[in-house]
Amino acid sequence: MAPLSSSTREVFSEAVRAVLETWPVLQIAVDNGFGGAFSQQKAEWMVDALQQYFTDNGDLQPDEVEDFISELMNNEFDTVVDDGSLPQVAQQVCGMFQQCEQGRLAEVREQILKLNQKKTSSGRAKATPAQTPQDDDDDDEEEAMDCEGGSAGASVSSTAVNDLHHEEEEDDGWTVVRRKK
């Protein structure tokens, strides 16, 4: 394998960046801080590390690249990738590297352009738990019931909760009976 020229290395580095920036697993890890306070810097470093891995090693197979990326994700982001996307990412990066080696830079640039368009049109994914309005109502009722129990550690005054229930119950036509303390 002949060493890549600086312009070819630059195109390959852009290709790696485009692939990783459109990979949802890495973006979720970065957006949610799985790598700590420096998650974004780790993702940028990962581009350089992967590009250097190809430069330092000859004739890499997709499974070797897959193992390397998996190790980086585990070490840097405490993330085990098991969604099936890792082989696709490795295959894509290997394919682009082979195209760069063969001097087919126009094809690689076209793929980079498509990936960048995909990135801007789809936005970034964010892993947040969804809460339905029904769940929210249940939580409020449970909190109110906990406060009414008169536990010594309650931080909400039971009179405020009782007043709230008093108003609700009076609207329904019921009479409120309170016990003495």
From Swiss-Prot:
Residues 118-181 are annotated as: Disordered. One of its GO terms (biological process) is maturation of SSU-rRNA from tricistronic rRNA transcript (SSU-rRNA, 5.8S rRNA, LSU-rRNA). Keywords: rRNA processing. One of its GO terms (cellular component) is nucleus. Residues 118-133 have a biased composition (Polar residues). Residues 134-146 have a biased composition (Acidic residues). Belongs to the TSR2 family. May be involved in 20S pre-rRNA processing. This is Pre-rRNA-processing protein TSR2 homolog. It comes from Danio rerio (Zebrafish). The lineage of its organism: Eukaryota, Metazoa, Chordata, Craniata, Vertebrata.
